[in-house]
């Protein structure tokens, strides 16, 4: 590489090499090179400055631009050099513009046109001091154009360029392996610091902005005026006559469109959201008046009943506040896939889209059928994304040979399925759901071969299903000696709790291609090592193993996590997420993009609120307007660097106002102090930047060469620190500091596989920060909440993406017992987090977590505790009907109006939420019903099980929820297995029905006057019964009868409670009847 007498150095901000004029002679030559040149924008000759030097707009590449175009570019344009994309700095004599000395996040998107990875501050620092050694000795004396062969794992290659480096680990037997710079030729790596289309003149692009049309017309008019002057003076240099044609180039709008933001926020219309906010404030005021009345008007003859109801109502009010205020700023988002393609997919050039590693996790193939997992994998392999940018990793935590064989057959079928999907652009790309959808598949399909190929593909898929089902039938009968491979070798996973790690690459760089001869995405089977005596941390541990394996084998900068039963329903889902992740303006602080969960196979009425529409269409939109949605465990695209525990890019404070904006007396008072602070800050920044020179061969400071021994010492210390944080794999540590991902192309596959086996060993995480600060966080069965919470505490923000076509679809529990079991697991995880050090009530202060976001996390861990007041409150109607008492005294006109306003505000709040959230009343009502059902059953049991697990150490083991499409074989099993979950709500139903019968009977026997007080108690009891109605329907099931054991236990418990209440009656005054003098003399 010809350096032209200039020094090679590195920019840590852009991760690129630049040329620095190291001596005066070289600087003079570089200036002379510009002499006589014309501005590459307008064609004018570049003028001289007041010091008789040629005007240079960009100090990085010296691209010829005249001062008028430079000032116009800074004032009206994108403020960046057209060639190297470096932001123009203010030159003495030029006016200030908005954005001077501001943070990189606010700079126009041209500067980071190809920089789609994050640049965390201390990640660059780690890359400086530990991953790259600056080199010594013979390197200094090497000629500028010499190629320097360096080791790549196990072999050497001298054909790679020395001006592109990757982090390579040479073989070493000593402690503390060193990391040296080595050439890097990965074609998937995005080009750094170069023009998008070098062969085109810069004038063809114009000036891009959001309002393109207006600003383009102004620019063309001004350019036309300049060209007329040039023509008149004869100074067009042969270019002037063609500029108008270039300005009218039809490709110009396309190129400018590619520079626009890739997404935008769509706030809820003010006509919908403002009344909603006003009503929330009114409801708060009504709530205050309500509690003022309730506290000041006790029920004297049933004081205990009144006090219990007030305590429950206060808890409900606090719970409502925690749930309501995170929905204060709901937003929606819109993506521009065409702009993403224009920006990163140039015709005739390699795709610039970032690679993505997809994680699929499964445990038990008998409860998570292999056919469902196979459909998920097929939908991933057929995704609309460059095949060399996608790698699918399937984690088999059960080490089942059934899963291994099914995945092998899936890889073979993918050779036919993937080209069929891409040829005809079908949706969805999971064959089971594509062939089962009821639609006219001939609609909009004009390809003459489509019908023929579709029928052939359906036959092939039916044969594939037969093979998978045959494997499942065979796996039902396990041999006594265990399974063996085809060559007679025992299957390593015969013992599920004691087996080595296993990795198998089915597709990818092994030479296997589809039927059309095209390359297929990589498909890797992973089963981590398990040994007795090690805590494997269930799903969270499996996901962390996938992070490390993928970092060694492919190291994509972004990760997609899906459950085995959630297939990709929208083939452009990954592109949708990249519109946020790769957006140069706002993408650098995004840690993950969460998609809503949508489900197949749910009945039309959705009696158990399986769709959870209120949460995904209302609550998550509200969180997206604050700091982003919480992570829900599937359908989420992560930034790898965020999972590594790095902090989000810090936002610098904007500079203070200049003297032109402040009064002169203020400048006299504050100018000196501000100047001194600025100097100190600049000195500190310069010192910090000097310590971050990643590719520097030597530090240059005023012509003095500083040896690099101190840098080496810091590198060794940082290397040890990184190994303590990430583990003892030098290859993984090297990959962890690569911000844009990638692995060395010439690395030996055998070496990579050996390293991958090491990082999934059961003892790899010992004495590291895995599960504590890195990856999926341990400590709860709901690791998703903890993982997202830690990222938000590090200052990251997340994004909620709701494309018109659902990105992912999955299967939901189909019967009541499965649904309650699922809710039980979620609630248990929340209780574990509440009782841990990561509880959002006291953890994460001083970080980047916003207050309303903290409210949401607090609500997500506190809601199981609501089961206690909820069950008590649902029991009060029966108590009131049995005792003839009530929770409120005789209602006055004021109290009646207050209660009416309270109920109206609750109803109208729900209506307005449904309006701006796009939720139907059926979904909203089912959500309200299941809140009571889940609170009275699963949440209560989760609360006690969580307390036993955390405080007493009694562990509760759960089985995976069945994902089978047919529930006939499992329905009865689950009903009898989870009997205890059904008893509390059944008991509430029975005692309230008994209370209604007793209350009505008492009113009939006591006459007309007793009907008035009875209405309030009946309304209270019927409110509970109506909310529990889906539970009653669910217990009847297909047999239209309730299991006998449930009926017996519930009636027995209800009878005991009723008799005990009649005997004790604690809410009635203990004294006898109050005798008063009536005023009549009865003795006479």
Curated annotation (Swiss-Prot):
GO molecular function terms noted in the UniProt entry: cellulose synthase (UDP-forming) activity; zinc ion binding
Active site per the UniProt annotation: 397, 784
Sites where the protein binds Zn(2+) 2: 58, 61, 81, 84
Binding site for UDP-alpha-D-glucose: 361, 367-368, 397, 538
Subcellular location: Cell membrane
Keyword presence, Flavoprotein: no
Zinc finger (RING-type) in chain: 39-85
Cytoplasmic compartment spans: 1-278, 323-867, 915-929, 1001-1011, 1063-1084
Residues annotated as glycosylated: 957
UniProt entry tagged with the keyword Nucleus: no
Gene Ontology cellular-component terms listed: plasma membrane
Enzyme nomenclature, EC number: 2.4.1.12
Tissue note: Strongly and ubiquitously expressed. Localized in some dividing and expanding cells, as well as in vascular tissues.
Superkingdom assignment: Eukaryota
PROSITE patterns: ZF_RING_2
Transmembrane domains' residue ranges: 279-299, 302-322, 868-888, 894-914, 930-950, 980-1000, 1012-1032, 1042-1062
Catalytic activity: [(1->4)-beta-D-glucosyl](n) + UDP-alpha-D-glucose = [(1->4)-beta-D-glucosyl](n+1) + UDP + H(+)
Coiled coil: 451-477
Record family assignment: Belongs to the glycosyltransferase 2 family. Plant cellulose synthase subfamily.
Subunit annotation: Homodimer. Interaction through zinc finger domain.
Described purpose of this protein according to its UniProt entry: Catalytic subunit of cellulose synthase terminal complexes ('rosettes'), required for beta-1,4-glucan microfibril crystallization, a major mechanism of the cell wall formation. Involved in the primary cell wall formation.
Name under which the protein is recorded: Cellulose synthase A catalytic subunit 2 [UDP-forming]
Organism expressing this protein natively: Arabidopsis thaliana
